[in-house]
C-alpha cells in the first residue's frame, strides 16, 4: 500500500484545509517539497493572497520573527512582526481590506527548539506577535522524513494539532 500522496494531491489538500489547519509535508531530502509552495502560489484560490517567500527555519534566530517595541509613554511593550511574514498594522485580522497571507516554513523540524517555540503561534494560531493573520491565511510547513536521520523532529504533543502528509 502506498502511503505517499502525489504533489497535486498534497497541493489540493493544502488548498482545501490550509486556512483551518497547518499541514506539514514530510518527504525525502531533495524531493521538491518547497516546490509545492510555488505550485500553491499559482492556484487561482491564492491569487489575492500575499505569498511571502518560503522561510528557511534553520536560518532564523532571535529577532527573526518579531522584535519588542517599547511604548514608554504607556509603560508597555509590543511585538512587532518581521515583514517577511506579511503581517503589519495595515494587514492583519480585523482590518478592512487586509489580504490573506500564504506562508511556507521550510525545514521546520530542523529548527532549534526555541525557534519552534517562537513559530508556534504562527503555526497554531495564525498570529505573529500580537497581530493575527487575516482570515483565509494559510501556513504550510516542510520537513524531511525523521527516519532519514537528518535531525528532523517535532515533539509528540505538538504533532497532534497538525496534519502530516508524505
Where are these regions (language model features)?
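AAA+ P-loop NTPase catalytic core and its hallmark functional loops
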Residues: 1-166
